[in-house]
Regions:
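N-terminal alpha/beta PP-like core and its mobile active-site loop of ThDP/TPP-dependent enzymes
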Residues: 1-187
Length: 187
């Protein structure tokens, strides 16, 4: 999970990882928390006990969704194999759209076999500076500021705006602080 987070931070693309149910999944906790605070688009796949034995105390069974509920942007649980493509696509879309980790929880028996399904088209958004009105308002605020300070973080990195942030800091003679886990947000 730490490697998936690192890959996502370095590439701006999805980092993906999968664990064994039970102890493998619980080993993801600190890495997924780090990805959450760094706004890394990580999709982590958590195999679950088989669909017919959930809640019966199977080998290494634990309730996996509550463990990650506060450190994910979205949690998808496949409750029917026919929804596999839909929920998988949703996890990948939400990881990028909301910039953070998503959990794809799949009962173990759904990993096998063939299904007929339509694969949804991924949602893509362009990262940009904002609309003209927002930019005008930001320029007015900066022009009126006596001691502007820049906080540069994950949004700057993912929007490939590090060089622009450096230029702005030079233009304004403004000090720059970086957000937690984003020392890469300013040169």
């Amino acid at each position: 999970a730490h490697m998936a987070d690192g890959y996502a931070r370095a590439s701006g693309r999805h980092g993906v990882c999968i664990a064994q149910n039970g102890p493998g999944v619980t080993n993801f906790v600190t890495a997924i928390a780090a990805a959450y605070w760094a706004h890394s688009p990580v999709v982590f796949i958590t195999p679950e006990t088989g669909s017919m034995t959930m809640g019966l105390g199977g080998f290494q069974e634990t309730e996996q969704l509550p463990i990650f509920s506060k450190i994910t942007k979205y949690q998808g649980h496949v409750n029917n194999p026919k929804r596999m493509a839909e929920i998988t696509t949703r996890c990948f879309d939400r990881a990028l759209l909301e910039m953070g980790p998503t959990q794809l929880n799949i009962p173990r028996d759904y990993f096998y076999g063939d299904i007929e399904c339509e694969i949804p088209k991924p949602i893509r958004i362009g990262l940009g500076a904002g609309d003209e009105g927002a930019l005008d308002e930001a320029a007015k605020l900066l022009a009126a500021a006596k001691f502007p300070v820049i906080l540069s973080g994950g949004g700057v990195v993912m929007g490939e705006g590090t060089a622009a942030a450096a230029k702005l800091a030079e233009l304004l003679h403004a000090p720059v602080a970086v957000s937690y886990l984003h020392n890469d947000a300013f040169p």
